Amino acid sequence: MFHSLWRLGMQWKGMVIYMIRGVRFKIPQKMDNIIFNILCCLNVESYYWFKISSQTEVWGEQIEEDFFEKEFYKGDEFINIIKNKHRIIFLKIQAYLKECDLKNIHTYEEFVDSNCDIIILVYDCEFVEIYSKNESTSILFFRRAKALGYKSCGYITDDNDSRTKMAVI
């Protein structure tokens, strides 16, 4: 039974089993290609990316330039954009493995029941939370954040997740 729980994304800790929901860490507040740096451990091209406009303020190198011009990107388009330098004020972006109906996901429960595989939330210019349905993807993001020297790296679990809404503002 333990093995099947682990395969479903469970982490054994003493007598309690915690589900790893994602990772959290702090990024530097500077103009850089931070989204690319975080996501390069993932096959970005295999996802469809949906930016939630009302929850996103990201600037390109020209201050008056909105970094993301569209709400929806195929993986190859998305990776070409995120390679450019940008400054994140706040961001909510959702990743899907297949093209489907896209909608703004408001709660963790909606995320679990949706076709969305990853939600990236950045707020206050430096705090990042990435939710993933796949534990191994969360581990990749955690290792990547540590390798980049990002601060306050940790896993988001059922036990420590205080977020009630998937929102950054």
Where in the sequence are the language-model features?
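Structural alpha-beta junctions
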Residues: 13-15, 41-47, 146-155
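N-terminal interaction modules that seed assembly of large macromolecular complexes
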Residues: 19-76
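Short, surface-exposed beta-strand/loop "edge" segments at domain boundaries and coil↔beta transitions
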Residues: 32-35, 57-60, 102, 129, ...
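Short, surface-exposed beta-edge/turn micro-motifs
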Residues: 45-47, 115-118, 125-128
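Surface-exposed, low-hydrophobicity interaction/linker segments
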Residues: 53-120
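Acidic, proline/glycine-rich low-complexity IDRs
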Residues: 122-169
